[in-house]
Amino acid sequence: MADSEICGKRPVVGRRVTLSGERNRRIFKPNVHKMRVMLPDGTVKRMYVCTKCLKAGKVMKAPRIPKEG
């Protein structure tokens, strides 16, 4: 599972608790997407970004350049 390259968010281990109180191990996975990001120097790079960083404006999605043909 990928980590967010902006904030370092990664999967964490926890427990699922049933109504009867039984506990089972589980993994909480962050909502991470691989997308094209424009860096401050203007270059475009593919990186893993969590949606919280995307909504907060910590990264800017790279503009799409239509193919000519």
Curated annotation (Swiss-Prot):
Organism name: Aquifex aeolicus (strain VF5)
Protein name from the UniProt record: Large ribosomal subunit protein bL28
GO CC annotation terms, alphabetical: ribonucleoprotein complex; ribosome
GO MF: structural constituent of ribosome
Keywords recorded for this protein, A-Z: Ribonucleoprotein, Ribosomal protein
Matching HAMAP family: Ribosomal_bL28
GO biological process, one term: translation
InterPro entries per UniProt: Bacterial_rp_bL28 (IPR050096), Ribosomal_bL28 (IPR026569), Ribosomal_bL28/bL31-like_sf (IPR034704), Ribosomal_bL28_bact-type (IPR001383), Ribosomal_bL28_sf (IPR037147)
Origin: domain of life: Bacteria
Family, as annotated: Belongs to the bacterial ribosomal protein bL28 family.
SS bond list: none
